[in-house]
Amino acid sequence: MAETESRKQQMNTDELRQQYEDGLVSIITPAYNAAAYIAETIESVFAQTYTNWEMLIVNDCSKDNTAEIVQSYAAKDKRIKLINLEENSGAAAARNTAIQNAKGMYIAFLDSDDIWKKEKLQKQLNFMQQNGYAFTFTGYEHFKETKENIQNQVQIPKSLNYKQALKGNQIGCLTVMLDRRQIRNINFTTQKQEDYILWLNVLKQGITAYGIQESLALYRTGNSKSISGNKLQSALWTWKVYRESQNISVVKSMYYMWFYVMNGLKKHR
């Protein structure tokens, strides 16, 4: 019985290797009216010490010249791939479209205004391959306008299982890398906090996420809304994640919300 199961697993692995390219990292980037920053984002990918990647940029019906900027890069380097959506669909749908077209065994996420440090892919891929991890993330920093204007560094745990992750989203989307051999259903919901929901759904399968204790990415902060307003809205969305997405009882949701608030207070140094 054990031998039969082992053969099935080997067959599944072989099928995945035929379907996806081993060692290739597919970078998923949704873009909407991103003309002001997307060149800097793409340049940070070009600067990576690990070069076996493809970057799938999904233009979500931008009204500026985002598509033209991306196309100018794609014309020079075939690793850049532009996908134009016919109608504005939101970041979750754009990411799903990119994932469906991705050829890599590894999936990484980078939004159109964020930046990676040059050793991000190399260090993270080594970390995953040496340990056999399916789900990893890294530390990152907030910056405003220019990458020299660092505001704070986000502290992350060394590892997270499902129950620990319910105490608050401590994983930055721009730092995540997933191994498709071990995680089959990588799909974003259209519900708010879609990245958090995906992490929870993956961890719910019994997978543990492991964090690299080093800042390898830069998250661009905006100032279109007040900080207090963002925090309140985020808390309301998190409550809906517990109740609607994860089907957690009111009492347990209140328990996890307490940790969510506490983690929010100590998240930044």
Residue ranges of each PLM-predicted region?
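N-proximal low-complexity "stem/linker" segments adjacent to membrane-targeting elements
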Residues: 1-46
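A conserved acidic beta->alpha catalytic loop
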Residues: 44, 51, 59-68, 87, ...
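Short loop->beta transition adjacent to catalytic acidic/histidine clusters or analogous donor-positioning motifs
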Residues: 22-25, 46-57, 65, 77-81
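Glycine-rich, basic loop-to-helix element that forms the pyrophosphate-binding segment
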Residues: 85-102, 123
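Conserved donor NDP-sugar-binding/catalytic core segment of glycosyltransferases
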Residues: 119-150
